[in-house]
Amino acid sequence: MVPELDAYRLAGYASIAGVTTVAAALSDGKAALAALRAARGKIENAEANLATCYLFINPTIYGMIEDLDTTASKKAIEGFAGIVKVPEGRFYSKIDLNASGEGGFKKNAAGKAINFLIVDKQTAIQYQKHTVSKIISPDVNQDADAWKFGYRTVGIVEAYDNKKDGIYVHTAGE
């Protein structure tokens, strides 16, 4: 819905203590395919159901895998409940939200770019505790002769302690 919300949720899952996190540079499609195969193996060996797992992936990495043009690359991507391509501008392991209503976010100094993230929906605890939307018509908008939409939300991004093996994070290497 909003880039900040996407970035917050993805960084939240990536920074949960106890989830599998691997950092490595992926220079080509073969390296990306090997990393994705290793992640799938880890998830499946942890007895997570791949059919309930979502793959969040950087479009560049996804393209490198697709460009291999082999059955192996297609098989590595099959079987997930869904595949979501996430722009690199909102795909970090840690972020800082801008304060005082100015909106937006930036990568935390300790944050790394995420290559891909696998999340089992049976592992994730995600819901909005409080959501407020406000629509201001042009008649009462004092800033401009236009509609104004305000959106404020507070949510939870956590994982069940006994199912943290259902989350796998692959970040860019140093």
Residue positions per predicted region:
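Alpha-helical scaffold segments that mediate packing/assembly in large oligomeric complexes
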Residues: 1-46, 169-174
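Long, contiguous amphipathic alpha-helices that act as assembly "spine/axial" helices in icosahedral shell
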Residues: 1-20, 46-48, 55-56, 138, ...
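Sequence/fold signature of self-assembling virion shell proteins
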Residues: 67-174
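Extended amphipathic alpha-helical segments with heptad-repeat/coiled-coil character used for oligomerization
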Residues: 42-60, 66
